[in-house]
């Protein structure tokens, strides 16, 4: 269904045309209109006035079928086509009107308008000149003269645009073409010429816009679809590239360049889709391998290299391989300093490496470009908590393990340190006190890091054994006394209070 506002707008644009229809309401007799045709014409006119374009069109189709030599039927059908934005369909009807009634200046004037919009300047000028020679009304004469002046200006601008293009002055050519296309809005060739200028000037997205318009204005425009596909490909948009090259092959399945390009895009698209599926499954090493294949498949297109590295950076970060993640993310950020995805992934890698200042800096930079991203906000808050925590007691440092250490590594480190710092090993009173404090920290670290829930709290910047951290202040940092840890074996897999442990 056509929107009422759209209908009003389109009818308004052909309003002078509709006035002519009113003048024609009594001319049916001149054409020898039979009763059925007259009925279709009158009903169609009422429906058109009411904005019911599809229904009006059906009536005028019936009128044309009933009397193929009735110029009024063709004229009114052309009016509906124009109101529906179907100028291509209107043009043959207007031509038929002129064939049937050569002195019908309104139809010739309207055809001149359409030809001018299509950029067919010589044909448009011919219509306007014939209008002036056919005893036009005062308004028709003024309109024809005005359009002749406009057409002459378009001829001059077109010549200047072509000269500028031939001289490789693409900026000047674009300026001239901009002015022409304000009038000759349906000129496919000029849009394609401007697209070439945009490509030369490094503005591929503007070129795509013109080429898309051209693909609709010109039938079977395989060349436009091919160029759109290659431009999307060079921009790194493999999905849209694949979609556009398929449109080319729908028009001509034997198109050599489109078919060759289709095979290349399809291969790349399959690799990327496979890699993304592996990422969803958490198979990061396999995904990295796929993206490395993407870079080998299309080394000549920079966009695929940088996008592949961006995803490899993400995989390393998620796979908790911080050194590799930082290296690859940094390569991306050297080229694209504001790449939010790479900033987030590198920040996560910095957290694993306990480089909190660097993580905070990356999160803050990312937030400048995407302030509403919840992941960035939460990451920044976590990094700030961990920085503050690192200035207090750090259980990972106490045991000498990395933040991504497995439970087995934590238990192994704990046992080694517990044996080393057990107070029973020290006879000197001062050394014993120092060992007691050290042993308490070691045991606390083991308790927190071997318990998944407590470890998660600590990883989020909260010390589960610190009253101040737990309650937001108001208490002293929690340290268990040596007495509370006695009877606790570093080799026990259960809780801390099994039996007294002695070294002999």
Swiss-Prot record:
Subcellular location field: Endoplasmic reticulum
* Positions carrying Phosphoserine: 274
**J domain segment(s):** 394-462
Annotated stretches, region: Disordered: 451-481
Q: Name the predominant localization.
A: endoplasmic reticulum
Q: Which GO terms describe its biological process?
A: cellular response to cold; negative regulation of endoplasmic reticulum stress-induced eIF2 alpha phosphorylation; positive regulation of translation initiation in response to endoplasmic reticulum stress; protein folding in endoplasmic reticulum; response to unfolded protein
- Chain segments carrying region Flexible linker: 375-393
Q: Which UniProt keywords apply?
A: Chaperone, Disulfide bond, Endoplasmic reticulum, Phosphoprotein, Repeat, Repressor, Signal, Stress response, TPR repeat, Translation regulation, Unfolded protein response
Q: Please name the InterPro entries in this protein's record.
A: DnaJ_C3_Co-chaperones (IPR051727), DnaJ_domain (IPR001623), J_dom_sf (IPR036869), TPR-like_helical_dom_sf (IPR011990), TPR_rpt (IPR019734)
**TPR repeats, residue ranges:** 37-70, 72-104, 105-138, 154-187, 189-221, 222-255, 268-301, 306-339, 340-373
- Disulphide bridges in this chain? 248-258, 313-329
Query: What PROSITE patterns does the record tag this protein with?
Result: DNAJ_2 (PS50076), TPR (PS50005), TPR_REGION (PS50293)
* Entry-linked CDD domains: DnaJ
> What is one Pfam family matched by this protein?
TPR_16
Q: Which segment of the chain is annotated as a signal peptide?
A: 1-31
Q: Which GO terms describe its cellular component?
A: cytosol; endoplasmic reticulum
Q: Name one GO molecular function term.
A: protein-folding chaperone binding
Q: What does this protein do?
A: Involved in the unfolded protein response (UPR) during endoplasmic reticulum (ER) stress. Acts as a negative regulator of the EIF2AK4/GCN2 kinase activity by preventing the phosphorylation of eIF-2-alpha at 'Ser-52' and hence attenuating general protein synthesis under ER stress, hypothermic and amino acid starving stress conditions. Co-chaperone of HSPA8/HSC70, it stimulates its ATPase activity. May inhibit both the autophosphorylation of EIF2AK2/PKR and the ability of EIF2AK2 to catalyze phosphorylation of the EIF2A. May inhibit EIF2AK3/PERK activity.
Q: What is known of its domains?
A: The J domain mediates interaction with HSPA8. Binding to misfolded proteins is mediated by a hydrophobic patch forming a large groove within the first two TPR repeats.
On assembly, the entry states: Interacts with EIF2AK4/GCN2; this interaction occurs under endoplasmic reticulum (ER) stress, hypothermic and amino acid starving stress conditions and inhibits EIF2AK4/GCN2 kinase activity. Interacts with EIF2AK3. Interacts with EIF2AK2. Forms a trimeric complex with DNAJB1 and HSPA8. Interacts with THAP12.
What is the protein's given name?
DnaJ homolog subfamily C member 3
What organism does the UniProt record list as the source? Bos taurus
Q: Which gene encodes it?
A: DNAJC3
């Amino acid at each position: 269904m056509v929107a009422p506002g759209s209908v009003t707008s389109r009818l308004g644009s052909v309003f002078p045309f509709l006035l002519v229809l009113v003048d024609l309401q009594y001319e049916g007799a001149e054409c020898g209109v039979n009763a059925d045709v007259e009925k279709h014409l009158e009903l169609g006119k009422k429906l058109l006035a009411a904005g019911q374009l599809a229904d009006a069109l059906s009536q005028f189709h019936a009128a044309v079928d009933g009397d193929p030599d009735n110029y009024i039927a063709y004229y009114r059908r052309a009016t509906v086509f124009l109101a529906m934005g179907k100028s291509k369909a209107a043009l043959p009807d207007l031509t038929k009107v002129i064939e049937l009634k050569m002195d019908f200046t309104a139809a010739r004037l309207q055809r001149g308008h359409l030809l001018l919009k299509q950029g067919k300047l010589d044909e448009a000028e011919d219509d306007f000149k014939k209008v002036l020679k056919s005893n036009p009304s005062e308004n028709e004469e003024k309109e024809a003269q005005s359009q002749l002046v406009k057409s002459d200006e378009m001829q001059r601008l077109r010549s200047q645009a072509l000269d500028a293009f031939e001289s490789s002055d693409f900026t000047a050519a674009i300026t001239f073409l901009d002015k022409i296309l304000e009038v000759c809005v349906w000129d496919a060739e000029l849009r394609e010429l401007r697209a070439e200028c945009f490509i030369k000037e490094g503005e591929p997205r503007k070129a795509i816009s013109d080429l898309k318009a051209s693909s609709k204005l010109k039938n079977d425009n395989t060349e436009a679809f091919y160029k759109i596909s290659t431009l999307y490909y060079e921009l790194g948009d493999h999905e849209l590239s694949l979609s556009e090259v398929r449109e080319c092959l729908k028009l001509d399945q034997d198109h050599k360049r489109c078919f060759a390009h289709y095979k290349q895009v399809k291969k790349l698209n399959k690799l990327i889709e496979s890699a993304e599926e592996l990422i969803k499954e958490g198979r990061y090493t396999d995904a990295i391998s796929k993206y490395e294949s993407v870079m080998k498949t299309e080394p000549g297109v920079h966009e695929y290299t940088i996008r592949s590295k961006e995803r490899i950076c993400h995989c390393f970060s998620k796979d908790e391989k911080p050194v590799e993640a930082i290296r690859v993310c940094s390569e991306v950020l050297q080229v694209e300093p504001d790449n939010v995805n790479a900033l987030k992934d590198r920040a996560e890698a910095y957290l694993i490496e306990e480089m909190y200042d660097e993580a905070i800096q990356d999160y803050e930079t990312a937030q400048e470009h995407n302030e509403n991203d919840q992941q960035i906000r939460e990451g920044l808050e976590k990094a700030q908590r961990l920085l503050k925590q690192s200035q207090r007691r750090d259980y990972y440092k106490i045991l000498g393990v990395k933040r991504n250490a497995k439970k087995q590594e934590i238990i192994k480190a704990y046992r080694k340190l517990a044996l080393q710092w057990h107070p029973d090993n020290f006879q000197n009173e001062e050394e014993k006190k120092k060992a007691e404090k050290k042993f308490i920290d070691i045991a606390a670290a083991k308790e927190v890091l071997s318990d998944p829930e407590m470890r998660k709290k600590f990883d989020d910047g909260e010390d589960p054994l610190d009253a101040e951290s737990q309650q937001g202040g108001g208490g002293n940092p929690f340290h268990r006394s040596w007495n509370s840890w006695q009877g606790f074996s570093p080799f026990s897999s259960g809780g801390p209070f099994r039996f007294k442990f002695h070294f002999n």
